Amino acid sequence: MGSQDVKGDSYESVYNKILDMQSEPGGANDLRTNRQRSFNIENRYVEKALTQPGVVTKMQDAWTNWTKTNKEEGTPYNMSYSCVLLNVIPTVPMGYAGTVEVSLLDSGLSPLENVIPDQTQMMELGKGPHVMCFFMHYSIPLNDKGRAVKLAFKIDAEMASKGMSVMNVYSYWTQRQGHLSAYSEPQRSTISKLMLGYDKSLKMKTRNDVRRFVGRSLSLHNQEQSVPALLPGQINVMKENVPLYRKESVIDLTREEREKAAQLEMLRKTREVHTQRSAEEMKRRQAELAKDTQRKLAEEAKAVTEKRKNMAGVNSSNIKFGNFDSV
């Protein structure tokens, strides 16, 4: 049957009704817009429709009733999904051995070829979070029974235990629907690795941060860095209200006496410095004298050696050897 112009008011009402149906709460296994989903390792292969099957059935019934009422039977109601974004966050440590393959499916196609061309991406779970983007360049009629656009997850993680989740998936997409069809040039799906930093909250910036943390489990009151002296060497118990660690020699001194004691202490230190310098000078002079003595002894020994050599040369020149032929 040929299509006819639809009535604005009636079409708008059914359009809003269909939109409201998609906002109805679904089951626990349904994947919806802005819905977090944790996929367990025990499900090696998972398919999740972008729109819940129960909602699609209600939408089909609402559209069929509207077309019959308005004598528009056969008029298609089209749905398309563009820019299906997935943030795949592994729940395993860095370097973990395992992969996940994500595809965008059209269940109306052949079971062996239901993956939309160029809409498959694979990531390694041990390389951190990735963002995937899938594109659907055409719309599908709501009239097709059992036809839906799905996300397929194929998980390969042999090292995980049974019932262990290996990733969390956050999804978002743009959906278009209405009596107008949609078709555009196809685009390849993309995958991007997220470059992340380090957790700032794990760093303790100052000693006070460490002190506050340790103070929650260890008493730090009345502690000091140096070793405290329990009692001094001598204690004059005859004097009252005097700190234990104050010097006994300056407790009862007057101001003049303290100044004189300070001057004497300064003279004593000066005398110690001069004495030390004199001792060092004496050591230096003794070292120089020892060097001179060694030098003189070496020169005398050398002179004696030269004298002996000269005497030996003079004596050898007076010796004559006889001739056996003259005898």
From Swiss-Prot:
This is Movement protein. Residues 252-311 form a coiled coil. Its main location: host cell. One of its GO terms (biological process) is transport of virus in host, cell to cell. The lineage of its organism: Viruses, Riboviria, Orthornavirae, Kitrinoviricota, Alsuviricetes. Residues 271-294, 307-327 are annotated as: Disordered. GO terms for cellular component: host cell cytoplasm; host cell wall. Transports viral genome to neighboring plant cells directly through plasmosdesmata, without any budding. The movement protein allows efficient cell to cell propagation, by bypassing the host cell wall barrier. It is found in: Host cell wall; Host cytoplasm. Keywords: Coiled coil, Host cytoplasm, Transport, Viral movement protein. Residues 313-327 have a biased composition (Polar residues). Pfam families: 3A.
